[in-house]
Swiss-Prot record:
Pfam families: HSP20 (PF00011)
Gene that this polypeptide is encoded by: hsp-16.41
The protein's name: Heat shock protein Hsp-16.41
GO biological process: defense response to Gram-negative bacterium; endoplasmic reticulum unfolded protein response; IRE1-mediated unfolded protein response; protein refolding; response to heat
Annotated source species: Caenorhabditis elegans
UniProt cross-references to CDD domains, sorted A to Z: metazoan_ACD (cd06526)
Amino acid sequence: MLMLRSPYSDSNALDHFLDELTGSVQFPYWRNADHNSFNFSDNIGEIVNDESKFSVQLDVSHFKPENLKIKLDGRELKIEGIQETKSEHGYLKRSFSKMILLPEDADLPSVKSAISNEGKLQIEAPKKTNSSRSIPINFVAKH
C-alpha cells in the first residue's frame, strides 16, 4: 500500500509551534487576560429587596464623588461615573453606566444615597407603607 504524505503537514505543525512560542514573547502579558477583571465598575455588591426597603451597593472606589451622577426617571435609577486623567505619559479615561429598575412599591421621593470612605456607594429606596388598615368596630349602647 502506498501512503502519500502532504508536503505541507510538517510545515504546518512547525508554523503552529513557532506561532505559539513567539506569540507569548511578542504580545504583552495582558493580551490573553480576562478583560472583565479590568472593568472596575462592574461590581454590584449587596442587593436587598425586602418588605421595608430596596437597596443596592456599588464599588465606585476608582471614582471621586464629584465624578459620579445618580438620576431617577420614574422607576429607572441611572448611576454614571466618568473619570479622566491626563499626564505627560498619556491619557486615561474610565467610565461606567448602570441602570436599575426600582420595585413598584418603592417610595421614589425618598430615595437617598451615601458613599463611604472606602468608595462603597449605597443607594436606598424605602418601600411605601401599606395604606390599608383595620378599622375597629365600636359598640354604642342605646339609653
